[in-house]
A protein has these predicted regions:
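Domain-scale signature associated with acetyltransferase and cell-envelope carbohydrate enzymes
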Residues: 1-153, 181-182, 200, 216, ...
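Glycine-rich hexapeptide-repeat left-handed beta-helix
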Residues: 139-232
Length: 232
């Protein structure tokens, strides 16, 4: 098959060019858009998709996920499926919190005590977030996590190459709490390392890597993240 594709693309023969043109004509054929037909169909499609998503969210995904939680407040809103939960992990969620189902929540498997993920009230946990809990991860009230945020409470592997090759877990000195105080906002793609506390009201710019604790009410960014300016 690869030889045929190569022949069609590179051969100077008339047969190859005709075949190539015919295949492309079939490949890129499109039905004409008829507004009177396709606009209502588009609306109907969206209504069906939304209705099915809400039905499965209410009757299936939300109760299924809540059965895994240690504690869950009122008005919890789960959308786009159900988060993947890995390892031994205690999860507590406050009131009026929203969470994307395309999220991974992971507890350190070698922990002596059960790792704790504590999420406050009115918190947004966005699309493709990963929260790896080594000991404890705390998200205060009104925290906002944009898409692809990574809270790395443990790394998963030791620094020693021999131990790593043997499949040994990370060492205790690589593990730490992560605390996001009230009103913190992490923009898209932010990574927060173990042992970090981010103070109340602080905003971290997209793509930053936070390796050290940040004070309250500042804008921070960069790799590693540094304070850019005070917000108050």
């Amino acid at each position: 098959m690869q030889a045929v594709k190569h022949w069609l693309k590179t051969s100077d023969s008339r047969l190859a060019k005709v075949c190539f043109d015919v295949i492309n004509s079939i490949r890129f054929f499109q039905v004409p858009t008829i507004s009177m037909i396709h606009k209502p169909l588009y609306w109907l499609h969206n209504q069906c998709v939304t209705g099915w998503a809400n039905l499965t969210r209410i009757l299936y995904w939300t109760p299924l996920f809540k059965s895994r939680l240690t504690q869950c407040g009122s008005r919890f809103y789960l959308y786009s499926g159900m988060p993947q939960v890995l390892g031994n992990l205690s999860i507590e969620i406050g009131n009026n919190t929203r969470m994307s189902g395309i999220t991974t929540l992971c507890g350190r498997s070698s922990a002596v005590q059960t790792p704790l993920l504590k999420i406050g009230s009115n918190v947004d946990v966005g699309w493709q977030n990963t929260i790896a809990v080594g000991t404890r991860v705390v998200l205060g009230d009104n925290v906002r996590l944009a898409g692809k945020v990574f809270l790395a409470g443990f790394p998963g592997h030791p620094l020693d190459p021999v131990a790593r090759a043997q499949g040994m877990p990370e060492t205790d000195d690589q593990v730490g709490d992560i605390v996001l105080e009230q009103d913190v906002w992490l923009a898209t793609g932010v990574t927060v390392m173990a042992g970090v506390t981010i103070g109340q009201g602080t905003v971290v710019a997209a793509g930053s890597v936070v390796t050290r604790s940040l004070p309250s009410d500042v804008l921070a960014g960069g790799v590693p993240a540094k304070v850019i300016k005070a917000l108050n």
